[in-house]
Every structure is written in structure tokens, then in C-alpha cells.
């Protein structure tokens, strides 16, 4: 029996597609195709091939607006991680490369550092789905006698951390809640990456490309760890005594860089004002390489952010009201990011601080450093337990 007309058309179309080199399309036609894509596919288009990337650079760019990673769940661990694009008011589900019941710990450009309830860590590119699995925490940890063992009783604690004679029961809440801090850095071109995360304020684990295990150095600081940032092969550690230490990871083994640390032995001295309640402290490295200490406080019913910067002449931390004309802050991100030239809505602009802690009022918004006002983002169509800012194409 001969082929039907529909079958013949389908076969002919398939042959045309196979014989046509889509990378050699006329640039004007390709530009129109790329500019018509959804925001997510628009960012994906630049990695198709070098020809597409060359055309992509000439396209009308989308606004530099942060997206949101959102979780539709009742608990800390979610089986439904989704991506929200505010420009199109669109939610992307079923993201490639993301495991069920895993949670975002840190981000770097289009990449996320993820961990699940089994303490399996991995890095994933949300736009391409490319994934890099990291060593399991149950494996041997270099430089320490600490080890993680799965608990037989999952009520409240899923893992136990043994450190010499001590043991600490670990619940999912303790690993994934907002009190934890982590940092991710990845080079899109070379694939080099660095990961660090803090557990229980006294355990700092690091891993970089080429390592066969996690590393821990308990002698880095006697006080506890508060926050981390990473730039130019150096890990910046902000401890509970308000000191900043810098460790160089450019060699085989990390070493403290005291000579090139302008913040050495210069702790932040902050006295709370009347009625102020200090909620959290974070650090962020500017594009100039200078470190900012950011305090989030609440006074009455208002959320406020105080930013401190080192005055190198006076050798002391001073509060500032500006961070530059083209930079903004994602609270907890570790680095300042490029800001849009003008206000694009939701208060996102130079000198703004995007923050989120849970997804209910008044715990998320955009703080204007110049005016002290907070803009609330539009609510989602779904009830969400958690959300985080995501910066596609900003890296």
C-alpha cells in the first residue's frame, strides 16, 4: 500500500529539516526568530552555536529584571521547583536537571547549587539542564575527622554529623532554612567551579573542580561562620565576631591571605539604634573588589537595610547610602550585580536591594537604599512556601 499524502508531507518536511543547516540561516531572519522567542528560550538561543551567539548579541536585549525560583510545597523540601518570569508573568515547570525534593542553596549566573534531603549536592544550569554531581557528604572529607552518617530514625533528624567525640543530629530544616549560608562560583567558559557551605555556624565545607572529596579546615576561625563570598579565587569569610578573613584557593591547598586583606583585624562595630532589631548580616563584593557588610534590621513595622563600607584612610567601617550608579544587591548573593539603567518596575534599579525570606508579606520585596522604601513584587498565582531571586543572563 502506498504512503498517504500526510505521511509523504511529513517525510518530506523531515528530509528538508535534516538537510538544512539551521546555523547558516540569514542573520536577519535568525534575528527575528530569536527576538520572537519566550524569555527562557531567548537566553538558551545564545548557546546553540557560535553563529547563533553572534546574532544573539545583536538582538534587542530583554530587560535586566530578576526572575524568581519558587517552590509549591508545604514543607522545606519541595517536589515542585519552578521558575517565574515577571516580564511574561509565566511560570516554567518541570525544569531539566533538577531532582525531586531538592533545594537551592546558592546561585551563580544561570547555575544553582542544589542539595536534597539525602545531602546529595549538585550544580545545575537552569537554562540548559546541564548538571554536575558533587561528591556525597557521606564520603570521606579531606582535612577533618568529621563525617556524615544517615540516621536510622528520620523523625526530626535525617543525618548525624560526627566530629571526634561529638555528634550532631541534622534535620532538613537545619540544612535548608535561611540561617544557612553557601556560595557558588562557576566559569561558564572553562567549566571551573567552586562551592562552599556552612553548617551549624561552625562547619565550613569546600569543594572545587578537580577535588575528589569535600574539604574542611577547622582552624580557619575560632568564632562561628556567618556568611561567605567568592571572587578571583579568594573566599571571603564573615565570622560571628564581625571580622572578615580571606583565603586564597588558587593553589592546591587554601591558605589565609593576611597580607592582602585590608579588613584584617578591623571588625564592624555596630550599635543598634532605639527600637531596632537586627535580623541578619551578609557580605557582598562589589565589581571594584571592595566588600560591603549589609545588615537587615526591623524597626517597628519597617524593614531596613544598613550598608557599611571600609574607609581605608580612617581604617574603619562606615555606613553608606549609595553603592554606585550601576550596581544592585541580591541579599545573600555574595556579589553585587549589574543593575538596569532605569527603574523597570517593582523597584528594581541601581541602589536597590532585592530580598526574600519565605513568600509571604512582609518578608519579600525590593528595598530602595536612597529612599528607604520597600516595593512588594506581584503575588504569584499559586501559594508558595519559598522563593529566591534568579538572575538569567546577568553573569
Swiss-Prot record:
Alphabetical UniProt keywords: Repeat
Pfam families: Beta-prop_KIB1-4, F-box
Gene3D superfamilies, per database record: 1.20.1280.50
Domain F-box: from-to ranges: 19-70
This protein's record includes keyword Ribosomal protein: no
Protein name: F-box only protein 7
Amino acid at each position: 500500500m502506498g504512503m498517504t499524502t500526510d505521511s509523504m508531507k511529513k517525510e518530506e518536511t523531515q528530509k528538508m529539516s535534516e538537510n538544512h543547516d539551521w546555523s547558516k540561516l540569514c542573520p536577519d531572519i535568525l534575528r527575528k526568530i530569536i527576538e520572537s522567542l519566550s524569555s527562557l528560550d531567548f537566553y538558551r538561543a545564545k548557546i546553540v552555536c557560535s553563529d547563533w551567539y553572534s546574532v544573539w548579541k545583536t538582538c534587542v536585549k530583554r530587560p535586566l529584571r530578576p526572575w524568581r525560583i519558587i517552590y509549591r510545597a508545604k514543607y522545606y523540601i519541595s517536589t515542585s521547583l519552578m521558575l517565574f518570569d515577571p516580564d511574561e508573568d509565566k511560570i516554567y515547570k518541570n525544569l531539566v536537571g533538577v531532582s525531586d525534593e531538592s533545594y537551592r542553596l546558592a546561585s551563580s549566573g544561570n547555575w544553582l547549587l542544589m542539595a536534597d534531603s539525602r545531602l546529595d549536592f549538585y550544580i545545575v544550569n537552569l537554562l540548559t539542564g546541564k548538571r554536575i554531581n558533587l561528591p556525597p557528604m557521606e564520603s570521606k572529607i579531606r582535612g577533618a575527622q568529621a563525617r556524615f552518617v544517615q540516621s536510622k530514625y528520620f523523625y526530626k533528624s535525617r543525618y548525624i554529623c560526627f566530629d571526634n567525640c561529638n555528634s550532631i543530629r541534622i534535620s532538613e530544616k537545619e540544612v535548608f532554612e535561611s540561617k544557612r549560608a553557601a556560595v557558588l562560583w562557576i566559569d561558564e567558559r572553562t567549566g571551573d567551579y567552586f562551592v562552599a557551605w556552612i553548617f551549624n555556624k561552625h562547619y565550613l565545607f569546600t569543594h572545587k573542580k578537580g577535588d575528589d572529596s569535600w574539604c574542611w579546615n577547622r582552624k580557619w576561625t575560632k568564632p562561628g561562620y556567618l556568611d561567605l563570598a567568592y571572587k578571583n579565587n579568594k573566599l571571603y569569610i564573615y565570622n560571628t565576631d564581625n571580622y572578615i578573613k580571606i583565603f586564597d584557593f588558587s593553589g592546591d591547598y587554601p591558605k589565609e591571605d593576611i597580607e592582602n586583606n585590608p579588613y584584617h583585624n578591623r571588625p564592624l562595630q555596630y550599635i543598634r539604634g532605639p527600637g531596632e532589631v537586627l535580623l541578619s548580616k551578609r557580605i557582598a563584593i562589589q565589581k571594584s573588589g571592595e566588600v560591603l557588610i549589609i545588615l537587615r534590621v526591623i524597626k517597628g513595622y519597617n524593614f531596613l537595610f544598613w550598608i557599611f563600607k571600609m574607609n581605608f584612610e580612617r581604617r574603619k567601617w562606615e555606613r553608606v547610602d549609595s553603592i554606585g550608579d550601576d550596581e544592585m544587591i541580591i541579599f545573600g548573593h555574595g556579589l553585587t550585580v549589574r543593575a538596569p539603567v532605569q527603574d523597570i518596575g517593582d523597584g528594581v534599579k541601581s541602589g536597590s536591594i532585592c530580598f526574600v525570606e519565605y513568600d509571604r508579606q512582609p518578608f519579600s520585596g525590593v528595598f530602595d537604599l536612597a529612599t528607604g522604601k520597600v516595593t512588594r513584587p506581584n503575588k504569584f498565582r499559586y501559594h508558595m512556601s519559598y522563593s529566591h531571586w534568579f538572575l538569567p543572563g546577568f553573569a
